[in-house]
Amino acid sequence: MSEVFEITVQPGGERFVCQPQQSALHAMETQGKRCLPVGCRGGGCGLCKVRVLAGDYESGRVSCKHLPVEAREQGYALACRLFARSDLCIERYSKPCSESTVDQQQRE
């Protein structure tokens, strides 16, 4: 039997298991979970961006546009290219509100 790791998604604490050869996103989808957004599944769109809060992992190839080196050094990864090497705690990425978004919300 192969090794299995548990991934906990914050906020909310939803959990799913992941095998070492599966991406975190693929493992989540196969278990019918919806705790992370799903995009291209190929590392090119950045929609499934997460921050690894705890645990060991490896990352596959991703678009530098959506995940620059500085972000990777701060623990950010794309779930579609995130391979657990231990139990992980990850955090969903939320884009900071831009002024135009705030202005638009205030007008509504």
Curated annotation (Swiss-Prot):
Q: Which residues bind [2Fe-2S] cluster?
A: 40, 45, 48, 80
Q: Name one GO biological process term.
A: catechol-containing compound catabolic process
Q: What pathway annotation does it carry? A: Aromatic compound metabolism; catechol degradation
CDD domains recorded:
fer2
Spell out the molecular function terms from Gene Ontology. 2 iron, 2 sulfur cluster binding; metal ion binding
- PROSITE patterns, per database record: 2FE2S_FER_1 (PS00197), 2FE2S_FER_2 (PS51085)
Question: Could you tell me the keywords of this UniProt record?
Answer: 2Fe-2S, Aromatic hydrocarbons catabolism, Electron transport, Iron, Iron-sulfur, Metal-binding, Plasmid, Transport
Report the residue ranges that make up the 2Fe-2S ferredoxin-type domain in this protein: 5-96
Recorded family membership: Belongs to the 2Fe2S plant-type ferredoxin family.
Report the protein's function: Ferredoxins are iron-sulfur proteins that transfer electrons in a wide variety of metabolic reactions.
What is the official name of this protein in its record?
Answer: Ferredoxin, plant-type
The organism is Pseudomonas putida
